[in-house]
């Protein structure tokens, strides 16, 4: 009977080790203590951020943030929530080892001990800088088109959804006068 329990536990541990290994292979992972000091960072994190282990371990989380964010109320709130066991996720602007902006799609995960007390925070992240740059370039192109051309948008039934300022100025209307009206 005990051998069966031990075998089940061994299988569970092996499976969990495999899952952790998969995460470490595919994601940037960093661990912080509750003061925001780096405890450990995997190779993916170090490579993504441009740091060596010696440069990262023992450093404050703020080191990876923009100076503005590191001094903000949002930063204080982030760590307050984490210390209270609240998971946080999103797209975060950070700064790499060369001082360049980098965008991370990340989750901050409070880790609790057996008594339910938060003891550290583990961050799982993926570099989405290229995606953010593409979105920024696409938005810049759309804004340039909006400034250069008269644009009006219609619903499938022919009613006006919106029009840009160039269209409104050239046609002598306000958006309120056109919105919802049929194009005829």
Where are these regions (language model features)?
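PAS-family sensory domains
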Residues: 2-5, 83, 93-99, 112-113, 117-127
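Sensory-domain boundary/capping and coupling elements
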Residues: 4-14, 132-146
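Conserved hydrophobic beta-strand signature of PAS-family and PAS-like sensory domains
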Residues: 29, 36-39, 151, 158-161
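N-terminal capping loop/helix in small sensory signaling domains highlighted by a polar->aromatic N-x2-3-F motif
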Residues: 33, 42-45, 164-167
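PAS/PAS-like sensory domain cap-loop motif
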Residues: 45-56, 167-179
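PAS-family sensory/regulatory domains
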Residues: 55-69, 177-184
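Sensory-domain boundary capping and coupling elements
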Residues: 106-108, 125
